[in-house]
């Protein structure tokens, strides 16, 4: 039996099942094996199988910034229920992003396998500001010149129905802009929204195809609103929320596919029903045998798992490096030591900032090598100084760049204390929106869960 007959004797479903267990980089290479394999790997059946398998085993994605250099790792998320109060897991290296000269860290977000870096200066030559869309699982990224004015912040949204990624840039006094990734005619498009509601500085969050962000009412300073942007239909909606409630928010979160607000407050009362004037308060006190909470760590909130576990991690690299999972329903805390992250370098000695993203899944969305430019509305920009062979027009340049692993970075500054720090788990309060249907802004109700750590 020759090789071709052996392959033909294997059922296609079995071949796809085997291939779906491979890393994304390997699948990308296997497209070149033959036309048959390329067709199989590009089929909707294989894409669905791969995404479902990846979603059933989500990982923790870690981005470590050392000077201007980013390194990306991932590690398994623990299964629930916990058999132990502490675990050790190994991290896998994905890529190193060496072309970044400087990055404003407040503009970093994650959506379905992609990382969005809003304000970045690329390479050592020049000072050209770009946005970067990075895919750690394949080692690829886009460098995109932003619209002008570039806006106070932007975010990456994902349309789960149309399977499209879009970048939204929000401005205070000008139109907003949006860019759809992967289309044949990539360009920034201006979109209209009410100038009455202006976005605040907090980063948006995308939940089920809707980007949420905190805004304020320019006509009534006592009114605070949450903006809702439908990624698929590119429409804005706004609903009012209690001023004192929004004032204590500094992070919008995804809590079991519902919008949540994460403040650093000791406790909070929440209005459940406006007509009945009904308030509620929920408190969770950690068991006294969880001694890990007494360790003096600078921790930051990084997200919530699909099971409702609240995840906190060290803000800066040090050895050992811990991530904590708190389950408010079971009142349990799990500490996970992540090993193998940058241990071959001086990664732990220079206060490198660590960004952690929960529920990381691999997908087969590929950047197109043939697309090298997009258009920017009504402006001209100088070309970036990125060292790559590609065409650009007078408006904007989009590039597909492979990561470089050999660039050395020696200048490292110590960052200031981030306001998203929780020392000793002093307090954690979670606000959850029960109804996240943006079409009915008058029907929102909130509940509260306050975790007090001893």
Swiss-Prot record:
SMART domains registered for this protein in UniProt: FBOX
Pfam family, one: FBA_3
Disulfide bonds: none
InterPro entries: F-box-assoc_dom_typ3, F-box-assoc_interact_dom, F-box-like_dom_sf, F-box_dom
CDD domains the UniProt entry points to: F-box_AtFBW1-like
Top-level lineage group: Eukaryota
Residue ranges annotated for the F-box domain, each copy included: 4-53
Cross-referenced PANTHER family: BNAA05G37150D PROTEIN-RELATED, F-BOX ASSOCIATED UBIQUITINATION EFFECTOR FAMILY PROTEIN
Name of the molecule in the record: F-box protein At1g67130
